[in-house]
UniProtKB/Swiss-Prot annotation:
Organism encoding this protein: Sphingopyxis alaskensis (strain DSM 13593 / LMG 18877 / RB2256) (Sphingomonas alaskensis)
GO biological process terms held by the UniProt record: nucleotide metabolic process
Protein name in UniProt: Nucleoside triphosphate pyrophosphatase
A single GO cellular-component term on record: cytoplasm
Family: Belongs to the Maf family.
Source organism, top-level taxon: Bacteria
Cysteine disulfide partners in this protein: none
InterPro entries: ITPase-like_fam, Maf-like
Function field: Nucleoside triphosphate pyrophosphatase. May have a dual role in cell division arrest and in preventing the incorporation of modified nucleotides into cellular nucleic acids.
Taxonomic path: Bacteria, Pseudomonadati, Pseudomonadota, Alphaproteobacteria, Sphingomonadales
Catalytic activities: a ribonucleoside 5'-triphosphate + H2O = a ribonucleoside 5'-phosphate + diphosphate + H(+); a 2'-deoxyribonucleoside 5'-triphosphate + H2O = a 2'-deoxyribonucleoside 5'-phosphate + diphosphate + H(+)
Amino acid sequence: MTLILASQSSGRAAMLRAAGLAFETTAAHVDEEMLTASLRAAGQTPRNIADALAEAKAVKIASRLPGVTVIGADSTLALDDGSMLAKPETPEEAADHLRRMAGRRHRLFSAAVAARDGAPIWRAIGEAKLWIRPLSDAFIADYVAQNWDSIRWTVGCYEIEGAGVQLFDRVEGDPWTIIGMPMLPLLTWLRATGLAPQ
């Protein structure tokens, strides 16, 4: 059976490769901004939005490829005041996000949904709590300048597996959820369905 990751995230692909899985990647091209805005307007939580985005990606690809198992994944970031941050579109927006998060806790929700024949067949959502230390404007400017090419694709403006680890005072949650996918539940399910080695 073929396994497809419906994501352009290098971090998610690296996690699956490191786990020894055979898979292909295909971008789903879901309008995440529009879907998120619609779900927020309907009163959905950041947790549910991560799940809905992951499902939309998986179902979109799975509906075109009969019999193929597709994994969609997405992450959302919520500040303690309930506001959500999206992927930054410019270095200036990344710096603004980091200023908003500095000295505060935020929650990161990472969802994975498996779909086959256009319908979801499995899902999991992980949650991590992260505390970003106080950051100076000079540190933020240097960090964004040095890491823009990688952080532009992340909701929190960091890759914790790289230079982003310098941002944090404290982290609660598994590292895979922070990188972008609830890997342990996913691997358990893939083994149970024969898509990963026992």
